[in-house]
Amino acid sequence: MTEQATKPRNSSHLIGGFFGGLTSAVALQPLDLLKTRIQQDKKATLWKNLKEIDSPLQLWRGTLPSALRTSIGSALYLSCLNLMRSSLAKRRNAVPSLTNDSNIVYNKSSSLPRLTMYENLLTGAFARGLVGYITMPITVIKVRYESTLYNYSSLKEAITHIYTKEGLFGFFRGFGATCLRDAPYAGLYVLLYEKSKQLLPMVLPSRFIHYNPEGGFTTYTSTTVNTTSAVLSASLATTVTAPFDTIKTRMQLEPSKFTNSFNTFTSIVKNENVLKLFSGLSMRLARKAFSAGIAWGIYEELVKRFM
């Protein structure tokens, strides 16, 4: 099998990213909604917000903008990430082949190029920052649609209100905090994810490790390795970047009060407490961990299917 034959087509990353992102967004929307509502009020608790929900369907409020943002964003991000990582791997002549055991002894669960930890960190951060800017308007609409501070009845009403009150800048409100959260998160995530895929096969019980006739892992084994790696990596990266998520949410919900990232940070620390910077972490942790497991598990397998 030649390098050209083993190289995934670019469209496979768009398709894999889109469906992985869409599935995780719809399935985990309740966690995202609860996280937003906990962060908007310094006295809010999970139990208090759950009691205010009149019907289970209300937990999926804001699903459309969330699904659009996550599916489109995931497709663009993973395509952009693959383009950068493949370009770097080509230059170093390090694109792995499923038939070259010396190259893939630690990453037989994946068909993605293998880079250094430093390269994984930088490509993940840069790709996320770029795509985050492109999808920022959808993010702002999504956050406000989920919040109880705005009672939008439709996406059209949300768009009209934001544009009328704040102009085009309103659709990019909180981008600085979002970028400070997402770029480090993505960089850390890709670094940890790729390293976990190398290490997990070495520590998993032998009953979980099965090989196909070509020498790579079976679908069961690769899915186990990739999904577990995604959950572990997302959990750690989410915890580290949690304060930026709280700052971003406050800026998008109360733009007149919180005008910039530093002002928001000092206000929370001074008027509330440092722990409030981690408000909603349990919801975000659960959502990001499961989301990464679902999205990256689907993405990795679809990429291999479209090779």
UniProtKB/Swiss-Prot annotation:
Present with 1550 molecules/cell in log phase SD medium. Gene3D superfamilies: Mitochondrial carrier domain. Pfam families: Mito_carr. Disruption phenotype: Yeasts grow well on the fermentable carbon source dextrose, but only poorly aerobically on glycerol, indicating a defect in respiration. Furthermore, the deletion strain is unable to reduce sodium nitroprusside, indicating that the defect is likely in heme biosynthesis. Nitroprusside reduction can be rescued by supplementation of the medium with either glycine or 5-aminolevulinate (ALA). In combination with a disruption of MCX1, abrogates mitochondrial respiration. Mitochondrial glycine transporter that imports glycine into the mitochondrial matrix. Plays an important role in providing glycine for the first enzymatic step in heme biosynthesis, the condensation of glycine with succinyl-CoA to produce 5-aminolevulinate (ALA) in the mitochondrial matrix. SUPFAM superfamilies: Mitochondrial carrier. Solcar repeats lie at residues 8-87, 115-199, 221-305. Belongs to the mitochondrial carrier (TC 2.A.29) family. SLC25A38 subfamily. It is found in: Mitochondrion; Mitochondrion inner membrane. It comes from Saccharomyces cerevisiae (strain ATCC 204508 / S288c). The keyword Repeat applies. It is a multi-pass membrane protein. PANTHER family: MITOCHONDRIAL GLYCINE TRANSPORTER. Keywords: Membrane, Mitochondrion, Mitochondrion inner membrane, Repeat, Transmembrane, Transmembrane helix, Transport. GO terms for molecular function: glycine transmembrane transporter activity. It comes from the Eukaryota. The chain crosses the membrane at residues 14-39, 62-88, 121-146, 174-197, 225-251, 280-298. GO terms for biological process: glycine import into mitochondrion; heme biosynthetic process. This is Mitochondrial glycine transporter. The gene is HEM25. It catalyses: glycine(in) = glycine(out). One of its GO terms (cellular component) is mitochondrion.
